Amino acid sequence: MTVVLCIDDTGGMMFNHRRQSRDRYVYADMAKEEFDVLRMDEYSLPLFSEEKVRIECSKDFLSDAQEGDICFVEDRDIFPYLNKINRVIIYRWNRRYPWDVDFKIDLKAEGFAIKTVNEFSGYSHEKITKEIYER
């Protein structure tokens, strides 16, 4: 499975039970990836209202994920699921935000290698960096 995360310059993901930021161009870019099902928590569903993709929501979406699925993760640790993950896509906001939930995993130490890095202009962000890691 593929996991997708959005983080700031310090690895922050959320603050006070809310996402740090959002950008509609990130979600449109994510929808262009090849996958069977886009899985997420219901909290994330409104972000994808304009995307024409198969979406399944559940509290246990990382456990439910199958090979070929993409999981959009905003608020939880993916470490318990590392054995199922073969690809990680990180969108970097290139800004610093307050955070109390962050991404702590050293992907290189876990056997991932960076495959591509692309930058694009977002809808509300001057620059977004997309990094794809694979093992």
What are these regions (language model features)?
Residues M1-R135:
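Enzymes that bind and transform nitrogen-containing heteroaromatic metabolites
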